[in-house]
Curated annotation (Swiss-Prot):
SUPFAM superfamilies: Immunoglobulin. The gene is B2m. PROSITE patterns: IG_LIKE, IG_MHC. It comes from Mus spretus. GO terms for cellular component: extracellular region; MHC class I protein complex. This is Beta-2-microglobulin.
Length: 92
């Protein structure tokens, strides 16, 4: 089943623009659904890297979006894959 890591590109500072990454690894087959969320709502503008595969033929992909952290906003990454019973959400 997929492994999910959510992290910012730069050390987070409230009010300072940053990039939020959702790195998903160890999945097969390659079809996967990745959504990034702000306060539970889907962020519409998310960019995806090309799908790549590791030596063991499992796949990995990076989703990322621009964001500006604040004290109150909650960010997360939600992943759905055929190997999972239900989507998994990982909070930042």
């Amino acid at each position: 089943r997929p492994q999910i890591q959510v992290y910012s590109r730069h050390p987070p500072e409230n009010g300072k623009p940053n990039i939020l990454n959702c790195y998903v690894t160890q999945f097969h087959p390659p079809q996967i659904e990745i959504q990034m969320l702000k306060n539970g709502e889907i962020i519409p503008k998310v960019e995806m890297s090309d799908l790549s595969f590791s030596k063991d033929w499992s796949f990995y992909i990076l989703a990322h979006t621009e964001f500006t952290p604040t004290e109150t906003d909650q960010y997360a990454c939600r992943v759905n894959h055929v190997s999972m019973d239900k989507p998994m959400t990982v909070n930042w």
